[in-house]
Swiss-Prot record:
The lineage of its organism: Bacteria, Pseudomonadati, Pseudomonadota, Betaproteobacteria, Burkholderiales. GO terms for cellular component: cytosol. InterPro entries: Fe_traffick_prot_YggX, Fe_traffick_prot_YggX_sf. HAMAP family: Fe_traffic_YggX (MF_00686). It comes from Burkholderia ambifaria (strain ATCC BAA-244 / DSM 16087 / CCUG 44356 / LMG 19182 / AMMD) (Burkholderia cepacia (strain AMMD)). This is Probable Fe(2+)-trafficking protein. Could be a mediator in iron transactions between iron acquisition and iron-requiring processes, such as synthesis and/or repair of Fe-S clusters in biosynthetic enzymes.
Length: 91
């Protein structure tokens, strides 16, 4: 049976991650309170940030920026939006 958690991002009970997705305290915090569904949403957001901002992941400053954005996305006021991003409309 899948482990269920109260997802901090989605505000509902959902299936938990199978393992901490990042090292350290942030990874542990995400593992304990973020669902698989919310993590998939972050991966899409992260990809947009990397591409739109042309981040070089070999650069420690780019990695530090993404770690801050990860924390803001799940536990703060939301991560930065990629410039020019327009969310898809339903209908």
């Amino acid at each position: 049976m899948a482990r269920m958690i109260q997802c901090a991002k989605l505000g509902k009970e959902a299936e938990a991650l199978d393992f901490p997705p990042l090292p350290g305290e942030l990874g542990k915090r995400i593992y304990e309170s973020v669902s698989k569904e919310a993590w998939q949403g972050w991966l899409k957001q992260q990809t947009m940030l990397i591409n739109e901002n042309r981040l070089n992941m070999a650069d420690p400053r780019a990695r530090q920026y993404l770690m801050k954005q990860t924390e803001k996305y799940f536990f703060g006021d939301g991560a930065d939006q990629a410039s020019g991003f327009v969310p898809p409309t339903e209908g």
